[in-house]
């Protein structure tokens, strides 16, 4: 569940009660006020009393932006504060709460909210994000302090429990939280959770929270293992989504090359107002799109699993602060299990084909003997689900996802908390697939089939995907410029861009980390949307002449100027002055005297 200040609006607020009615610790109440909340949301007003007063386990299903994070953090913090009052100050209690999330990005996000809530009680409640980017020696030192609350991914926690015995004391554990539980299972953490259960004091009074935007049958196994007569909270979000989440969904049937052409026209002419999140299906596609956009002077930044964790978090933070208007995110997560209820039984073999497609190379060419960029990807990276992207006006599926469920996760980054948003998806018809090899993506072969499933899925929710209408003649006028710019972005240029970007981000992430901690203001000057320039940039492509613009957008004609290939001033400067300097450097002053 993502956290967003003042993003939860009317439909989710329960103004019939206040946080004071829960009889919380004064320090916790003050922290909640500092964050900016006066009334709890519906899920908070139901879950907090059940957890605090009745000590019930909680299984909750609620939409993104409904306040699930505070629904479990507040009871955890309040109970630990009460427990601290009953023990001696010098008594070691070990870890009291564990919060498990599917990705590193979500772990950092939850940890940031946790830090704000324990602002006035940090002496009593120490926190640690074990999935953050730190060395093993530093992590071991921090674990020696026995933090009361630990946030991390199941894989990282299991690794610590197995390899660093006694580094985490779970004898007095009181809380286990699994956030975005369906995604945790989808990422293949089922076995990790079972193994973690062997280290937990399940026979004691361990209180469990299982939180998610969707609940399915796979959660039953976790329910039986970790929960005791849980309270199951399900909120009917269909009416809320219809009335409040005004998400406009469009699709465009377009050829592979025309994806780049449409992107150029849309962003160069500012047809989308506000911040845009673009999803691509692999890392190379992200860099190709960025480099093509650079040809036309369109700035963007990249977010993918190769970048260091610190850089990824900084990119998300700056995007939320409106430093960037265009973010290209790689969503190359391989789902372990397909969970689309809408898919017919007869298409099971197709699902297997689609999953295998995600791992196939972009082209059908034989592997090159040339040395390729070999960078270790972060298995705990995830961007299409849970990450807190604020005020996203549009989600553009440059590459259509390989499952209908993944589509829901992507478009869920916009139209959150009752705000409006737009989702546009590029779909490659089967007859157009493979016609333009340089821009081809293997997963596009299944686009039409996936689109039909998405339409069917959304129709069950009362939502509709409409074809995106635009003037084809106006777009065709830009085609020759796109062909010119696209030709300059070669595979070699993409490889060089990836290497250059990694070097820049590693430098900023590792060597400057301590410097930026001491000088936080200088961190603001670190930008991630700088031009990479590994391709030949043609400056004349960065401006759009008036004759290409629609009549309504044209000026009075005085702004249109010819852009020469050579600098006229430099060419004529040699003609000025008839007297040239002799080779020996000596000049007769009398001959030049006037």
UniProtKB/Swiss-Prot annotation:
**SUPFAM superfamilies per the record?**
P-loop containing nucleoside triphosphate hydrolases (SSF52540)
A GO molecular function held by the record: mRNA binding
Any one of the GO BP annotations: maturation of LSU-rRNA from tricistronic rRNA transcript (SSU-rRNA, 5.8S rRNA, LSU-rRNA)
Give the Helicase ATP-binding domain ranges: 49-233
Major enzyme class:
hydrolase
Q: Does the keyword Oxidoreductase apply?
A: no
Compositionally biased region (Basic and acidic residues): 345-366, 585-594
| Pfam families, per database record | DEAD (PF00270), Helicase_C (PF00271)
* A GO cellular component entry from the record: nucleolus
Q: Which domain of life is it from?
A: Eukaryota
Protein keywords: ATP-binding, Helicase, Hydrolase, Nucleotide-binding, Nucleus, Ribosome biogenesis, RNA-binding, rRNA processing
Segments carrying motif DEAD box: 179-182
Compositionally biased spans, kind Basic residues: 567-584
Task: Show the InterPro entries listed in the entry.
Answer: DEAD/DEAH_box_helicase_dom (IPR011545), DEAD_box_RNA_helicase (IPR050079), Helicase_ATP-bd (IPR014001), Helicase_C-like (IPR001650), P-loop_NTPase (IPR027417), RNA_helicase_DEAD_Q_motif (IPR014014)
Region listing for Disordered, in residue ranges: 339-377, 558-594
Q: Where does ATP bind?
A: 62-69
Q: What is known of its domains?
A: The Q motif is unique to and characteristic of the DEAD box family of RNA helicases and controls ATP binding and hydrolysis.
Q: Which family does it belong to?
A: Belongs to the DEAD box helicase family. DDX56/DBP9 subfamily.
Q: Can you state the subunit structure given in the record?
A: Interacts with DBP6.
Q: What is this protein called?
A: ATP-dependent RNA helicase DBP9
Its organism's taxonomic lineage begins at: Eukaryota, Fungi, Dikarya, Ascomycota, Saccharomycotina
Q: Which gene encodes it?
A: DBP9
């Amino acid at each position: 569940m993502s956290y967003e200040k003042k993003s939860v609006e009317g439909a989710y607020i329960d103004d019939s009660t206040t946080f004071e009615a829960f009889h919380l610790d004064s320090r916790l109440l003050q922290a909640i006020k500092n964050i900016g909340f006066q009334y709890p949301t519906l899920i908070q007003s139901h879950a907090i009393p059940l957890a605090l007063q009745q000590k019930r386990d909680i299984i909750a299903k609620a939409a993104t932006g409904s306040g699930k994070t505070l629904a479990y953090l507040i009871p955890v913090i309040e109970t630990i504060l009460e427990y601290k009052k009953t023990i001696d100050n010098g008594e070691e209690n070990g870890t009291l709460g564990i919060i498990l999330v599917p990705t590193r990005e979500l772990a950092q996000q939850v940890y940031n909210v946790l830090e704000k809530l324990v602002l006035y009680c940090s002496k009593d409640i120490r926190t640690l994000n074990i999935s953050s980017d730190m060395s093993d020696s530093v992590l071991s030192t921090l674990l020696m302090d026995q933090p009361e609350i630990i946030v991390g991914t199941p894989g990282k926690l299991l690794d610590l429990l197995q390899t660093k015995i006694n580094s985490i004391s779970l004898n007095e554990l009181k809380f286990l939280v699994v956030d975005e539980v369906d995604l945790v299972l989808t990422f293949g953490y089922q076995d990790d959770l079972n193994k973690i259960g062997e280290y937990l004091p399940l026979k004691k009074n361990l209180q469990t929270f299982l939180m998610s935007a969707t609940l399915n049958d796979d959660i039953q196994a976790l329910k039986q293992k970790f929960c005791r007569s849980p309270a199951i909270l399900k909120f009917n979000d269909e009416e809320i989504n219809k009335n409040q989440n005004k998400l406009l969904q469009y699709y465009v049937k377009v050829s592979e090359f025309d994806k780049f052409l449409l992107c150029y026209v849309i962003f160069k002419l500012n047809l989308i107002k506000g911040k845009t999140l673009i999803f691509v299906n692999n890392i190379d596609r992200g860099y190709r799109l960025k480099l093509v956009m650079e040809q036309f002077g369109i700035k963007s930044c990249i977010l993918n699993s190769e970048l260091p964790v610190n850089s990824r978090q900084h990119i998300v933070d700056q995007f939320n602060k409106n430093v960037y208007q265009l973010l290209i995110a790689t969503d190359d997560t391989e789902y372990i299990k397909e969970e689309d209820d809408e898919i017919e039984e007869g298409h099971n073999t197709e699902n297997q084909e689609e999953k295998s497609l995600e791992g196939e190379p972009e082209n059908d060419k034989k592997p090159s003997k040339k040395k390729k960029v070999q960078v270790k990807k972060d298995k705990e990276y995830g961007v299409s689900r849970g990450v807190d992207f604020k005020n996203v006006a549009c989600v553009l599926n440059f590459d259509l996802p390989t499952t209908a469920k993944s589509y829901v996760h992507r478009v869920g980054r916009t139209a959150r908390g009752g705000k409006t948003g737009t989702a546009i998806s590029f779909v490659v018809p089967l007859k157009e697939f493979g016609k333009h090899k340089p821009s081809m993506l293997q997963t596009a072969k299944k686009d039409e089939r996936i689109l039909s499933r998405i339409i069917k899925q959304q129709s069950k929710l009362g939502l509709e995907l409409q074809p995106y209408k635009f003037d084809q003649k106006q777009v065709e006028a830009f085609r020759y410029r796109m062909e010119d710019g696209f030709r300059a972005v070669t595979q070699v240029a993409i490889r060089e861009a990836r290497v250059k970007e990694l070097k820049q981000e590693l430098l900023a992430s590792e060597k400057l980390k301590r410097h930026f901690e001491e000088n936080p203001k200088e961190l603001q000057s670190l930008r991630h949307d700088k031009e990479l320039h590994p391709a030949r940039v043609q400056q004349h492509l960065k401006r759009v002449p008036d004759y290409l613009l629609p009549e309504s957008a044209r000026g009075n004609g005085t702004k249109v100027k010819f852009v020469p290939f050579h600098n006229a001033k430099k060419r004529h400067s040699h003609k000025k002055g008839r007297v040239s300097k002799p080779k020996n450097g000596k000049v007769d002053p009398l001959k030049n005297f006037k």
